């Protein structure tokens, strides 16, 4: 299963089960279960959305779930999950009103998803705040450019993920944006 945010046309785009969007029925069932279980607890839209995704994925007994952290990381609803692998693809100046004014501040927020004894994959040009968090947790991240990279072939419409000079995967360019190549790891 997987999640993404934001959706473009309809909420169902946020939750994928077995490679397909969750159905209206699956999502409504999830919302009903969450609403009845929450009691007097108030949930934000994002918390409700994250719980719905987790409910749907758990109900399908998925072996693997790829959960896209939405806003930031440290305070994101999905950060309640203790993942085996954490991926930070890039740090830009987004959501500055919530995450901070600089790449360092935003990096510190995004690095809030990192846990000890975890595999970590990092995109290009990580701010020192991310690397410091890795060091504080004794993590050894796989870094874009050092451990892996890619080669785009526009004519063939593919990109190849390479590790130590050896091609690992060839993926259609339409499957993933080239600047998010770290997601494939």
What are the functions of these language-model segments?
Residues 1-2, 86, 141-143:
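Conserved beta-strand scaffold positions in the cores of enzyme catalytic domains, especially
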Residues 2-81, 97-99, 105, 128:
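ATP-dependent carboxylate-amine ligase catalytic core
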Residues 21-43, 93-107, 111, 118-185:
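Adenine nucleotide phosphate-binding catalytic loops in nucleotide-utilizing enzymes
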Residues 79-90:
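Inter-motif core of Ras-like GTPase G domains
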């Amino acid at each position: 299963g997987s999640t993404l945010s934001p959706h473009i046309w309809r909420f169902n785009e946020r939750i994928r089960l077995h490679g397909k969007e969750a159905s209206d029925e699956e999502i409504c069932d999830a919302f009903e279960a969450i609403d009845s279980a929450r009691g007097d607890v108030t949930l934000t839209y994002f918390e409700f959305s994250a719980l719905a995704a987790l409910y749907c994925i758990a109900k399908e007994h998925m072996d693997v779930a790829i959960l896209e952290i939405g806003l930031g990381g440290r305070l994101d609803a999905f950060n309640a999950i203790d993942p085996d692998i954490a991926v930070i693809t890039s740090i830009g100046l987004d959501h500055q009103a919530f995450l901070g004014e600089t790449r360092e501040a935003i990096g510190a927020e995004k690095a809030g998803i990192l846990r000890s004894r975890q595999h970590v994959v990092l995109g290009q040009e990580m701010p020192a705040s991310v690397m410091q968090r890795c060091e504080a947790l004794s993590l050894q991240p796989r870094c874009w450019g050092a451990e892996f990279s890619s080669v785009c072939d526009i004519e063939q419409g593919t990109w190849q993920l390479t590790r130590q000079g050896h091609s690992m995967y060839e993926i259609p360019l339409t499957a993933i944006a080239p600047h998010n190549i770290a997601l494939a790891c």
